[in-house]
Design a protein with these regions (language model features):
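DNA major-groove recognition helix of helix-turn-helix/homeodomain DNA-binding modules
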Residues: 67-85
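Short amphipathic helical patch at the helix-1/turn junction of helix-turn-helix
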Residues: 24, 35-36
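Residues within the helices of the helix-turn-helix
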Residues: 31-32, 43
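Residue-level signal for the short linker/turn that defines the boundary of a DNA-recognition helix
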Residues: 28, 38-41, 66
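Short alpha-helical DNA-recognition segment
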Residues: 39-57
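N-terminal flexible/basic segments that precede or flank functional cores
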Residues: 1-28, 89-91
Length: 91
C-alpha cells in the first residue's frame, strides 16, 4: 500500500481530531493508524513499536490498563504521544 505524504498527513490529522473531540477512542485510533496509514499487520506493527502483539491487541480492543510507555510506543511513529488536555465544561 502506497499513499502520498499529503494523504498520510490528512489521515493522521483526521484521527488526531477524532481523539481530541472524543469521537474516536484510543484503541480505534491505533487500529486506524496501523491499518490505514502503515498498512501493517499487528505482528509487524508490534515489532516496529517494540511491544508484544498481545499488548497491541489489548490496546486496539480497549482492554486492560495499558502503560503510558506502551501507548506512546504506538503513537510515536505518527509524531504523537499521550498527553493531558483540559476538559471543557458546558455551562
Amino acid at each position: 500500500m502506497t499513499i502520498t505524504l499529503d494523504a498520510r498527513a490528512l489521515m493522521i490529522e483526521s484521527i488526531e481530531q477524532g481523539l481530541a473531540d472524543g469521537s474516536l477512542e484510543i484503541g480505534a485510533a491505533v487500529r486506524r493508524l496501523r491499518t490505514e496509514v502503515t498498512g501493517l499487520h499487528q505482528s509487524q506493527f508490534a515489532k516496529m513499536c517494540k511491544i508484544s502483539v498481545r499488548t497491541l491487541v489489548h490496546i486496539e480492543q480497549g482492554e486492560g490498563n495499558q502503560t503510558l510507555k506502551s501507548l506512546n510506543a504506538v503513537f510515536r511513529p505518527f509524531g504523537m504521544k499521550m498527553g493531558v488536555v483540559k476538559v471543557r465544561r458546558s455551562l
